[in-house]
């Protein structure tokens, strides 16, 4: 059996090391502690690690304290009042169960849905379609407007997957249906917490959206999407692809002569061929010898690499389908006691109180939308050039009737904590006074050109930080065909559409001209589209009593830099460029201890102003401000009240 050899720990005792390690102080303390222990007659005069840690950190020593026995259990409760249908209010009573209540999550199942059957149109007819757009099925020989002659144009009907549909057929097609983005966030329009008729806190779906944009860490986003009904892309790969590898320092070429910044010529060395052949061995072996012998250095400049392409696709609730299956949602509540177990409410301190969670549900039209289930196919043969053909598609989008979505399994899961009777009695007998953080929200409409300023009259109490966004009214308008995608975005959203043709060729007789209109082409039925969110605030300012706290800062400073610098792992930089953050605390959301605030209850002249090139009399918007406000919760006489109400 081998034994370890002797070793020495060599410490550099330079000036910096003396400050960082304080080795002289450590040696002196050890000696002093030994002398003191000897003077007291202790059999073991050596110091303890806890004594050493009074002045020095010991990284290899772990600590623990005994803890008060505690257990927890999730308890399901059904609605106390309210009809469980979309658009209604549900009220859940918090039962007297356990000693504390902490986490809460709502569970709902949205029933399956589909659109109604519709008749295929007759060629030459027109009908008013979705979002006020006239739909026309042109006659052959005419352009899309059904009035301008277009020689060689032939029209047929197809479904979204290119399958033909006979014009005039009864019950020939159905529109597809899909859910809005993050339906779990939109489902809860408003959530309120009441004790004995007093509202202690409430928040809207805008607050939930901003919390997700700024506070849900990236490593938990996939799980969060599963909970709130947002589809997650799946990864696919292609087969093996052969690639040529290029190296500018090719071994078979002479050494190139380059000129540096001082106009001095210098000779460059080429890459070692043996080095390259080790990394790209595909042309260094044949099929028979691959993997059986050492790689042979080569002098050929062509190195090969075999790779795969990665593709992403989605098939979740936001993907249009003829039949949307039932959708289960798990929606976490966002009150102060839900976020931090240290602030769990002692249920035993409110033995006779009425504790309720009231939830206002969104309507069905805000959650589901239709996708056109019928398209008009234009196939045009160019007269005199029979080899040229262009194929284009346009949707025939007539709204159907979406089946009513049922709402089942309406439950509120409450995390109840249990402690020993001795600890239980302490909370029953004593008055509890704790610092809490509640939501204060203000939504203000604006239609002023270029510049506007709003008084934050709905904000009060000490404010630690604010999430701010200017949301175009168009984003939630029924006339917006993409409002189910845009509803949560704080900016103007435009569509970027890929080039419509995915096949193009030049006929043999047109090869000499090679003009764009000489090509045959086939467009996609539904071209690839991706949204681009454009921030609509250029500069933002915050003033209190006429004093500029933030003076025309660019919006990117508040949307990117502030959340990047502050908050540690508790705050992230949002993907939405229009979502902004302003903080008055040094460590927002990082720790329970406050680290800065502005008391807007005293500074009532509290304004937010901004510059914009988007907002006007037609392109209106709503300013959304969600603030974290400090208050104090007083538990006494069987009830819970806020210390400050104004």
From Swiss-Prot:
Pfam families: Capsid_NCLDV
Cleavable signal peptide: none
Gene3D superfamilies, per database record: Adenovirus Type 2 Hexon, domain 4, Major capsid protein Vp54
GO cellular component: host cell cytosol; host cell endoplasmic reticulum membrane; membrane; viral capsid
GO biological process, any: virion attachment to host cell
Keywords attached to this entry: Capsid protein, Host cytoplasm, Host endoplasmic reticulum, Host membrane, Host-virus interaction, Late protein, Membrane, Viral attachment to host cell, Virion, Virus entry into host cell
Primary role: Capsid protein that self-assembles to form the pseudo-hexameric capsomers of the icosahedral capsid. The capsid is constructed of 2760 pseudo-hexameric capsomers and 12 pentameric capsomers, with a T=277 symmetry, about 200 nm in diameter. The capsid encapsulates the DNA-containing nucleoid, the core shell and the inner membrane. Plays an essential role in virion assembly. Involved in virus attachment to the host cell.
Protein name as annotated: Major capsid protein
Lineage of source species: Viruses, Varidnaviria, Bamfordvirae, Nucleocytoviricota, Pokkesviricetes
């Amino acid at each position: 059996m081998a034994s370890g050899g002797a070793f020495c720990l060599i410490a550099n005792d330079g000036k910096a090391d003396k400050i960082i390690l304080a080795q002289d102080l450590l040696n002196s303390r050890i000696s002093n502690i030994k002398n003191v222990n000897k003077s007291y007659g202790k059999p073991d005069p050596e110091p303890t690690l806890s004594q050493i840690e009074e002045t020095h950190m010991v990284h290899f020593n772990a600590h623990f304290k005994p803890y008060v026995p505690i257990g927890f259990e999730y308890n399901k409760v059904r609605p106390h009042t309210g009809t469980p249908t979309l658009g209604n209010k549900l009220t859940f009573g918090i039962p007297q169960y356990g000693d504390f209540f902490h986490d809460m999550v709502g569970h709902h199942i949205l029933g399956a849905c589909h659109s109604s059957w519709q008749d295929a149109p007759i060629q030459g007819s027109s009908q008013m379609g979705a979002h006020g757009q006239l739909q026309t099925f042109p006659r052959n020989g005419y352009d899309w407007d059904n009035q301008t002659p277009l020689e060689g144009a032939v029209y047929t009907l197809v479904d979204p997957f290119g399958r033909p549909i006979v014009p005039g057929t009864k019950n020939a097609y159905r529109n597809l249906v899909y859910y809005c983005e993050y339906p779990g966030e939109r489902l809860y329009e408003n959530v309120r917490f009441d004790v004995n008729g007093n509202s202690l806190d409430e928040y809207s779906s805008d607050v939930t959206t901003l919390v997700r944009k700024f506070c849900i860490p990236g490593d938990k986003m996939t799980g969060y999407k599963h909970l709130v009904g947002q589809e997650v892309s799946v990864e696919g790969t292609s087969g093996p692809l052969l690639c040529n590898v290029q190296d500018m320092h090719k071994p078979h070429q002479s050494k190139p002569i380059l000129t540096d910044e001082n106009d001095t010529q210098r000779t460059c060395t080429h890459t070692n061929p043996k080095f390259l052949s080790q990394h790209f061995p595909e042309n260094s072996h044949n099929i028979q010898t691959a993997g059986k012998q050492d790689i042979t250095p080569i002098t050929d400049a062509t190195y090969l690499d075999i790779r795969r392409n990665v593709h992403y696709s989605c098939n979740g609730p936001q993907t249009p389908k003829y039949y949307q299956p039932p959708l289960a949602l798990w929606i976490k509540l966002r009150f102060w006691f839900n976020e931090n177990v240290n602030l769990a409410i002692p249920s035993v301190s409110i033995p006779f109180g009425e504790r309720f969670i009231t939830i206002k549900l969104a309507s069905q039209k805000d959650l589901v939308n239709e996708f056109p289930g019928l398209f008009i196919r234009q196939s045009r043969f160019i007269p005199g050039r029979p080899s040229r053909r262009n194929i284009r598609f346009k949707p025939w989008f007539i709204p159907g009737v979406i089946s009513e979505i049922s709402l089942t399994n309406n439950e509120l899961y409450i995390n109840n904590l249990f402690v020993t009777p001795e600890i239980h009695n302490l909370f029953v007998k004593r008055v509890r006074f704790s610092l809490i953080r509640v939501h204060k929200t203000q939504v203000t409409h604006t239609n002023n050109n270029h510049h506007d300023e709003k008084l934050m009259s709905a904000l009060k109490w000490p404010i630690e930080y604010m999430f701010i966004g200017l949301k175009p009214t168009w984003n939630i308008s029924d006339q917006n065909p993409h409002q189910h995608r845009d509803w949560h975005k704080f900016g103007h959203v435009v569509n970027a559409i890929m080039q419509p043709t995915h096949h193009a060729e030049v006929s043999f007789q047109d090869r000499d001209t090679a003009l764009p209109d000489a090509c045959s082409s086939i467009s996609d039925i539904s071209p690839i589209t991706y949204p681009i969110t454009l921030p609509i605030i250029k500069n933002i300012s915050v003033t209190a009593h006429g004093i500029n706290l933030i003076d025309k800062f660019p919006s990117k400073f508040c949307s990117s830099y502030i959340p990047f610098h502050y908050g540690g792992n508790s705050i992230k930089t949002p993907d939405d460029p229009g979502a902004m953050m302003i903080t008055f605390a040094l460590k927002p959301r990082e720790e329970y201890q406050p680290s800065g605030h502005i008391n807007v209850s005293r500074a009532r002249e509290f304004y937010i102003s901004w510059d914009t090139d988007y907002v006007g009399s037609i392109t209106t918007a709503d300013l959304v401000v969600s603030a974290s406000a400090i208050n104090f919760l007083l538990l006494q006489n069987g009830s819970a009240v806020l210390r400050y109400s104004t």
